[in-house]
From Swiss-Prot:
Keyword Mitochondrion on entry: no
Keyword Iron: no
Function statement: The UvrABC repair system catalyzes the recognition and processing of DNA lesions. UvrC both incises the 5' and 3' sides of the lesion. The N-terminal half is responsible for the 3' incision and the C-terminal half is responsible for the 5' incision.
Gene: uvrC
GO cellular component terms, semicolon-separated: cytoplasm; excinuclease repair complex
A Pfam family this chain is assigned to: UVR
PANTHER family tied to this protein: UVRABC SYSTEM PROTEIN C (PTHR30562:SF1), UVRC/OXIDOREDUCTASE (PTHR30562)
Family, similarity comment: Belongs to the UvrC family.
All copies of domain GIY-YIG, residue ranges: 16-95
Protein name stated in the entry: UvrABC system protein C
Organism domain of life: Bacteria
PROSITE patterns per record: GIY_YIG, UVR, UVRC
Any one GO biological process: nucleotide-excision repair
Classification via InterPro entries: GIY-YIG_endonuc, GIY-YIG_endonuc_sf, GIY-YIG_UvrC_Cho, Hlx-hairpin-Hlx_DNA-bd_motif, RuvA_2-like, UVR_dom, UVR_dom_sf, UvrABC_protein_C
Amino acid sequence: MPDPATYRPAPGSIPVEPGVYRFRDPHGRVIYVGKAKSLRSRLTSYFADVANLHPRTRQMVTTAAKVEWTVVNTEVEALQLEYNWIKEFDPRFNVRYRDDKSYPVLAVTLNEEFPRLMVYRGPRRKGVRYFGPYSHAWAIRETLDLLTRVFPARTCSAGVFKRHKQIDRPCLLGYIDKCSAPCIGRVSAEQHRQIVDDFCDFLSGKTDRFARELEQQMNAAAAELDFERAARLRDDLGALKRAMEKQAVVLGDGTDADVVAFADDELEAAVQVFHVRGGRVRGQRGWIVEKSADPGDSGEEQLVEQFLTQFYGEQAELGGAADESVNPVPREVLVPCLPSNADELTSWLSGLRGSRVALRVPRRGDKRALAETVQRNAKEALQQHKLKRAGDFNARSAALQNIQEALGLSEAPLRIECVDISHVQGTDVVGSLVVFEDGLPRKSDYRHFAIREAAGQGRSDDVASIAEVTRRRFARHLSEQNDPNMLSPEGKSRRFAYPPNLYVVDGGAPQVNAASAVLEELGITDVAVIGLAKRLEEVWVPSEPDPVIMPRNSEGLYLLQRVRDEAHRFAITYHRSKRSKRMTASVLDSVPGLGEHRRKALVSHFGSIARLKEATVDQITAVPGIGVATATAVLEALRPDESKAAP
């Protein structure tokens, strides 16, 4: 463990200007990023008596081996640079906002030609608008059921859309007028996008305009004695009003604001945000925050600053639109307290919005009452998280301890990797590698392997495939470990930078012995290897004649099963994808100069390969990007008999 005194810079060498600093570990990875009004004052505080530091700060400075800094002109520049570096390096000791993905949102895929309305859980993506979150998925479906009467936008998946386009017949929603059926050309892409834009405007708070328009249309239809249409418009108006009733008015002055509140303990904090648009709560989001390692960053003022910087910085990147309805930064941000650099933060937020933003603490009235409601939600979220964390942590700790005791390991296997092989009768043979850290899946470290040497031409050898994946995984680890140039200059981890404590293979004695032989061949002796056989859930250890039998109800066996099943799922998914690509390979793939984009354009234009085969050169050249030479080559590929018969 590095001693902070070994890399402490001389106090006189640290500038007193504002700037941003970063700590690196012995491998060069960035582990913490911070900013300061005075670099000298802030950095000196890290090298005080280690015993007096906050436990997380103490762990950070004893993990680090180097500190470096960049001087900037203003605190606003420091704020922006700190945000950029945290986003780029993802330092392990910085505050991390884990978005509560358990709540569903209503997503609108504006980045598609025909945008889709759908229930969504997961990280935010660029080009997609989100409304919510909602307490339950059924609440979103109920809202969609009401609003698609008035805004008949597409809600189907890409597969369903493609299928109905091919058969030239809409789905049930198209027949009952809850979808405008863009799949069969009932509306154009521009008309469908206008429907979606109106839907987004309604959910953004511009509700009165649509209600007035429907009421006018209803009265006009009644005046023309078109009572059937008037009745339908009356029902549509009722659906709109019921949807509006679901969003309570909390601020009567048409306020556009985000209301932020925190609840914290010594290690973590809960953040809750209510998004108020047009005086109505349009959504609620929550995060759980691991507190920073910075000795001055544990107070509420610092939590406010860090949250605003990370949240609105990411929202601006995902949104980036200047229109008021989709601007990621509201006119007003209400917080429990103002940070010391409130003026700089306000200036930065105003720059993101493109107009003035007010950052203030609500003192009285409805805004104060709403802030107290958000605060109660934050306290409840932190309490629920602590209860859940205690249960999860105890179960995972027990599982890791069970595995350690059953296998006689020197320490608990904090990083477990598992490999599995998937194929059908020797075709499309693939391997998967999944990673669990501290008993939880680390999906960013998952890897696929296309088996090269141990399979091919309809043959497959599972044992040899296990050996191949093991060799490729650990050979890469050794090359990164021994070659300093393989380390990312930005301090990011390479794919196989960390070896596992426990390496699990799906199978029995032959598979585990093959993996063990590869590790022995590579000179790796500090990685335990086991095999988990499916039928009896036996745990096989290299060179042992009998398996280890773990209790059927033990947490350790349950964790190993989860790891093995996840590896199997990941391998099956990749195998199916690879097989599907092979089975759907088109004769167009062989046309020289015809790339994937233009192949899709041809099939989309004609609807099928059969129709394309019947087309003429002139009809094919009507597709954007297709010239005469390419059209001729396409027809030669589709009509090989005719091209051979031609003189």
